[in-house]
């Protein structure tokens, strides 16, 4: 807190100083069973010094089989864990002591299967189906819709109370990628995903996560035209479309008292902003010269 912050109406919410380290040992082994089949296995672990959180054993497996004629199938799965945003550990009680030093890692189990087909002239198609179960997610002790699974979906920081690792959630979806590598002065890349993302806070109600737009589509392409002996004109474009971000109704009275945005638990993330759409066009000119 200083003269500049006082003039702007800012005040110190938390003031904490400390050090932390995240240690992540891992071992990975790849076995080429045959010319058509590969198998990858690994074990990951991590230790967070700030809270003494330990994840001693996170196995991860991957398998791929080439069926010939440019086709391949794959499958994989594994356990993962991650720390929380650093500032959330520094929540302070009225006596100044940090109140979230008992927070553990968020954890997840991932699985997926895929298929790909390569054609002549640099053209290929890939598709993948996946499922992720998220658990050990920090949520409030008192029943509410809050979950750390949604933190990071916006630009504001959340000054939450003490948290416990009892929340969970899941994601599942289907991805499709169609790609043509640059050949004969032309390329394109299409990727599309349809998915569902749900979570459960300490009130045990399933809700949309803030990221649950349900679909994302991207298209990128370009073409070059030779002009004369030394010049090239390029035309390219990119189109992105995605489902709108989820949101809820603001609790105006509580937000005013707390001096930050507090959402109502009822209907949280039931509402959705309009879908996102963006299109970009690029035109370029390139000239090759012996002196350049």
Regions found by a protein language model. Give the residues of each.
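Repeated loop/turn-to-beta-strand initiation elements of outer-membrane beta-barrel proteins
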Residues: 36-39, 70-73, 121-125, 184-188, ...
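Outer membrane beta-barrel strand-and-loop segments of large Gram-negative receptors
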Residues: 13-24, 100, 104, 124-187
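Residues on the lipid-exposed face of transmembrane beta-strands in outer-membrane beta-barrel proteins
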Residues: 25-29, 61-65, 113-117, 174-180, ...
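Conserved C-terminal beta-signal and adjacent last beta-strands/turns
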Residues: 208-292
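Surface-exposed extracellular loop regions of Gram-negative outer-membrane beta-barrel proteins
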Residues: 17-51, 56-60, 65, 69-111, 131-161, 178-196, ...
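Transmembrane beta-barrel strands of outer-membrane/channel proteins
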Residues: 1, 41-47, 63, 75-79, ...
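Gram-negative outer-membrane beta-barrel transporters
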Residues: 36, 131-133, 158-244
């Amino acid at each position: 807190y200083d003269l500049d912050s006082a003039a702007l109406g800012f005040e110190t919410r938390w003031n904490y100083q400390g050090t932390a380290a995240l240690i992540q040992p891992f071992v990975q082994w790849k076995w080429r069973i045959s010319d058509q089949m590969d198998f990858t296995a690994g074990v990951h672990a991590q230790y967070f010094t700030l809270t003494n959180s330990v994840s001693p054993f996170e196995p991860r497996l991957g398998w791929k089989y080439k069926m010939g004629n440019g086709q391949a199938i794959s499958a994989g799965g594994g356990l993962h864990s991650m720390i929380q945003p650093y500032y959330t550990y520094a929540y302070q009680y009225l006596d100044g002591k940090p109140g979230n030093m008992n927070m553990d890692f968020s954890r997840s189990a991932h699985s997926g299967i895929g298929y790909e087909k390569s054609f002549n002239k640099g053209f290929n198609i890939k598709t993948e189906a996946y499922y992720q179960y998220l658990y050990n997610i920090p949520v409030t002790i008192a029943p509410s819709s809050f979950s750390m699974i949604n933190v990071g979906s916006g630009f504001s920081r959340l000054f939450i109370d003490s948290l416990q690792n009892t929340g969970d959630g899941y994601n599942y979806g289907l991805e499709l990628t169609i790609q043509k590598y640059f050949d004969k002065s032309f390329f394109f890349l299409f990727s599309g995903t349809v998915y569902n993302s749900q979570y459960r806070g300490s009130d045990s109600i399933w809700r949309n996560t803030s990221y649950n737009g349900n679909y994302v589509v991207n298209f990128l392409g370009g073409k070059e035209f030779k002009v004369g002996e030394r010049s090239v004109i390029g035309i390219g474009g990119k189109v992105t479309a995605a489902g709108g971000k989820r949101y809820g109704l603001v609790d105006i009275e509580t937000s005013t008292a707390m001096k930050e945005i507090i959402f109502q638990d009822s209907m949280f993330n039931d509402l959705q902003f309009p879908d996102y759409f963006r299109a970009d066009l690029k035109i370029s000119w390139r000239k090759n010269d012996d002196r350049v």
